[in-house]
Amino acid sequence: MNILELELLTDSITETELFYTGVIGLKTISKTNSSVSFAAGYTKLTFRSSENLKPVYHFAFDIPNNKLLEAFAWIEKKTEIMEVVPPEKIADFYNWNAKSFYFYDNNGNILEFIARFSLDNASEKPFDGLSILSVSEIGFVTKNVSQLSDELFNKYGLSVFSKQPKLEKFIVLGTDTGLFILVEENRDWYPTHQKAKSFWTKVVFSNNGKTREIEISD
């Protein structure tokens, strides 16, 4: 699965553009009074204007799997990286064959840079925002994780991620290149104590040769 487009809400278009261009180094590809879009590798990442909603999301960017420490040092110069298990700041997902680190954006969204060692995506270029390969994960928050998982399977053919067994309150759908993270409402967003809540989200993704769209109301 590949996430081709991701649309989220923000209470501040201006501050969001400053963060994503200045800190992460993404290129702005379009902007209006009510939205701004960036190129995050092959994913088009769009923020649409909201008012006093304080929306918070959890999503991940894939980076070349030989650039984790370089990306860490590059981001650390610009913003604070979270501790996962103090004092460690790099998470090792052994079952996923991946490592990642986390930081907040200007909206309080929890962002993740993840290196997946099962993929062939190494790069010899110095790391910067143009090194980002895609948005590879987005969290969906629901009152009933199993029910949402079944709905997404029935409607879109999305199967459980082979490297992550199903849990009652946490199910991952997709493949190494694109994942939907289904979590129960009010569960802590890893690695924070931020309670997960649902906000409007739209995703355009490709799976098994078909391009589909999901819209989560809230």
Where are these regions (language model features)?
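Short acidic/polar mixed-charge low-complexity motifs
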Residues: 43-44, 109, 178-179
